[in-house]
Design a protein with these regions (language model features):
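A Lys-centered signature of the CheY-like receiver
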Residues: 9, 106
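Helix N-cap/capping motif at the beta->alpha junctions
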Residues: 33-42, 64
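Short amphipathic alpha-helix used as the core "switch/output" element in two-component signaling
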Residues: 42, 65-76
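Receiver (REC) domain active-site loop signature in two-component systems and cognate sites
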Residues: 59
């Protein structure tokens, strides 16, 4: 069973992602939530065992690109999948070069989540 951290400034989107993860039939145990990159780093620093991080790109305080850099700068190798409405290849390339493992575009279905995340967790 996997513990997952969802980092997104929209509480509604965090709930949708959480529900979709469970509907996809993925082996999910705990789901932790953070409203931006700073909160996400705090969850990680708390010592919780996390096997997957899902992060939005556009967030206040610390966006997803900065968040990925900070996670990797701390030596954390947990897979990070960017969840975004951004369609531009450049922003996805930047996220990947910062250390993101993959990306998925909103909106998505539970089946799409299963396909994208099934091999990771």
């Amino acid at each position: 069973m996997a513990n997952i951290l969802i980092v997104d400034d929209s509480s509604t989107m965090r709930k949708i992602i959480s529900r979709s993860l469970r509907q996809a039939g993925l082996p999910v145990d705990e789901i932790y939530e953070a409203g931006d990159g700073i909160e996400g780093l705090a969850v990680i620093a708390s010592g919780k065992s996390i096997q997957l991080i899902l992060s939005d790109i556009n967030m206040p305080n610390m966006d997803g690109l900065e968040f990925v850099k900070a996670v990797r700068a701390n030596g954390n190798s947990t897979p990070i999948v960017m969840i975004t409405t951004e369609g531009g290849e450049e922003i996805i390339k930047e996220a990947m070069s910062n250390g993101a493992s993959d990306s998925i575009k909103k909106p998505f279905t539970p089946d799409q989540l299963q396909e994208k995340l099934g091999s990771i967790i």
